[in-house]
């Protein structure tokens, strides 16, 4: 807290008055890092989530999720070791992190509800299982494993995640069309040129 106050040019008490605990500072840092300039702190209120919710097909909806959520993970990923270390010694940090994770899952649940309501999930796939699949695969820890530990580019990682989730969530013919060369579902997205590796 002393270092934050010093860097901000304010009194330590000002930092404590604003954030109260180190856990609150850490979570605020994650939310700030995850956002874009002038974007709302709450992910579900960001413009790209509106595009996800309004997408006309399940393939496009999934492609937008992969494109934008992983951009967030690229920004917050470097903070995860600090979260892990702080959680092991400060229960407040652990609780705050779990709260953030729970909000992420709830937001993903709202998106899965849209897939289900529009009949975009493959036959027999229960929405709760679909949520587990997205929540398990689309996360910062997996992003770090592939991009840092395996050395993949962001585009390759996004293409893999899209192909993996499309195969698990979408009806086979929808997934096949979304993964096809020249697919309009991904034509304007960063990972389009890497899809051939996983289709």
Identify the function of each model-found stretch.
Residues 81-83, 95-96, 123-124, 145, ...:
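Short, hydrophobic secondary-structure boundary micro-motifs
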Residues 27, 85, 148:
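Phosphate-coordinating loops and pocket residues in cytosolic domains that bind phosphorylated ligands
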Residues 71, 106-121, 131-199:
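C-terminal peripheral helix-coil segments that are non-catalytic and often amphipathic
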Residues 1-6, 85-91:
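Helix-loop segments that flank and shape redox-cofactor active sites
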Residues 64-84, 91-118, 128-132, 164-167:
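Amphipathic alpha-helical packing segments from all-alpha helical-bundle domains
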Residues 22-24, 28-31, 35-74, 131:
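Hydrophobic alpha-helical connector segments
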Residues 1-28:
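Helix-turn-helix
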């Amino acid at each position: 807290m002393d270092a934050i106050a010093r860097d901000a040019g304010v009194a330590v008490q000002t930092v404590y008055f604003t954030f109260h605990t180190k856990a609150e500072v850490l979570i605020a840092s994650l939310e700030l890092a995850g956002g874009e300039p002038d974007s709302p702190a709450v992910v579900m209120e960001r413009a790209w989530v509106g595009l996800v919710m309004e997408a006309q097909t399940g393939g496009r909806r999934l492609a937008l999720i992969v494109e934008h959520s992983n951009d967030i993970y690229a920004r917050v990923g470097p903070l995860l070791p600090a979260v892990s270390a702080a959680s092991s010694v400060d229960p407040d940090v652990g609780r705050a992190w779990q709260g953030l994770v729970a909000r992420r899952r709830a937001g993903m649940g709202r998106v899965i509800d849209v897939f289900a309501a529009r009949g975009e999930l493959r036959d027999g796939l229960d929405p709760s299982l679909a949520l587990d699949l997205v929540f398990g695969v689309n996360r910062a820890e997996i992003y770090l494993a592939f991009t840092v530990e395996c050395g993949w580019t962001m585009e390759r990682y996004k293409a893999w995640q899209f192909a993996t989730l499309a195969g698990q969530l979408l009806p086979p013919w929808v997934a096949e069309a979304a993964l096809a060369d020249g697919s309009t579902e991904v034509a304007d997205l960063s990972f389009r040129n890497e899809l051939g590796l996983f289709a």
